[in-house]
Amino acid sequence: MKNMKLKVLLALCALLLLSAFIAERKDPITIFMIGDSTMANKSLKNGNIERGWGQMFPGYFTEEVVVDNHAMNGRSSLSFINEGRWDVVLSKIHKGDYVFIQFGHNDEKPRATLHTEPGSTFDDNLRRFVNETRA
């Protein structure tokens, strides 16, 4: 029992010592949001009550986290890439930031500018977002 208490005490001291060497991030963490209308910011004009969940998301954080919502109505993973929207987001990402991805509703539409195939091009686009974010 004494041996276990000593081990726990040593572990806590080691954690305390290590935490002194962890560099604090000076900039806030940014959560980038990419997706379709389900996530997008909506106009508040003319009594519109519709909101994308990404529009409400910043209210759950302190000033240490910035939410940068790039989701747009009517976009698929394909159109988001082809319109250059992904390149804009990618150019802003720094180590320690996050990217939340929410596509699918428009990827299933038959229009060539939107359509992707599950298990093929849709998956490829999602992998691209993840791999390029990690790079």
Question: What are the residue ranges of the model-derived segments?
Answer:
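Serine-esterase "nucleophile elbow" of acetyl-processing enzymes
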Residues: 22-71, 88-92, 99
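Bacterial N-terminal signal peptides that target proteins for export
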Residues: 1-10
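Short, solvent-exposed loop/turn segments at secondary-structure boundaries
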Residues: 43-47, 79-82, 112-117
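Extended interaction regions within the primary functional domain
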Residues: 63-69, 79-83, 132
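Bacterial N-terminal signal peptides
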Residues: 10-19
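Solvent-exposed loop/turn segments at secondary-structure junctions
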Residues: 37-41, 72-79, 105-110
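Alpha-helical cap/lid subdomain in secreted, periplasmic
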Residues: 2-3, 25-26, 85-135
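Residues in and immediately flanking transmembrane alpha helices
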Residues: 18-20, 49, 115
